[in-house]
Amino acid sequence: MLKIVLKALLIGKKSLTLQFKAFDMKKTILIAMSSAVLLFSSCAQEYNRVYKSQDYTYKYEYAKECFANGKYSRAVGLLTELVTIEKGTENAQESLYMLAMSEYCLQDYESAAQYFKKYYERYPKGYYAEQAKYYVGESLYASTPEPRLDQSPTIQAISAYQDFIDVYPDSKLKDQATRRMFELQDKLVIKEYYNAKLYYDLGTYFGNCTSGGNNYQACIVTAQNALSDYPYSNMREQFSILVMKSKYQLAKMSVISKQMERYEDAQDECYGFLNEYPDSKERVTAEKYIEGCKKFIEKHQKDPMYVPQI
């Protein structure tokens, strides 16, 4: 009986100890949370005091501290005012650069591009001029859309990088800027491919051909322009496939007076494709088209209805 009582007392003691430990843990957490709230409140009060201050030197130093510690939102709030108030002073140049970089770090790339551009325009010989010129391109690069969308921002980014390379041909950032340009050009190539492929897929549909012509002709023009504009693209074969297929389909749907000429053109295109891409996955298609063109030409080459009149 005594053993049972002692065991019960021991269990109770352990339970009480655990309860005290749990209480101490909760107390520690509450103290930590309270301290964090007080610290945040204190920091917020300090920021508000600085923000309302007319001591612009103090405000500038506080903004630099915020920037250095990664508190970019607070830095922006102070620097936006300082770049106007301190215009023409020693601190104005660094304030504008920190503002631009803060916006960049906050992923407000449109504002960042504007401020970096403004910095370079105001201080073309400034301490951060090279970085600012480069980050105009970086800001535009970061905001470029995926290839299916309008690529105007992509063209602007390419132009910005090219401007940077022209102004700083010996910069350590030149190679990175060049890589960015090639990457963005690839995006333009993909956009052109989507456009050409869309025309091909629309095929004989005329609802979108309000200015005459047809979708196969539009596909051919778009793809050939891309081949001319981007001669080193790794998508040359894809564009060539679209040209070949479109020329064959165009010949099939043409009026009698144009069919012979277009079948001959399609046949030449297929031969050219096989010469350039002998191992293409579309080799069988090209050979099939050549056979179709030959049959048509042999059948109608003496028929005056199909032979163009000179």
What would you call each of these model-derived segments?
Residues 6, 11-12, 17, 22, ...:
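Acidic, polar-rich low-complexity tracts and alpha-helical solenoid repeat scaffolds
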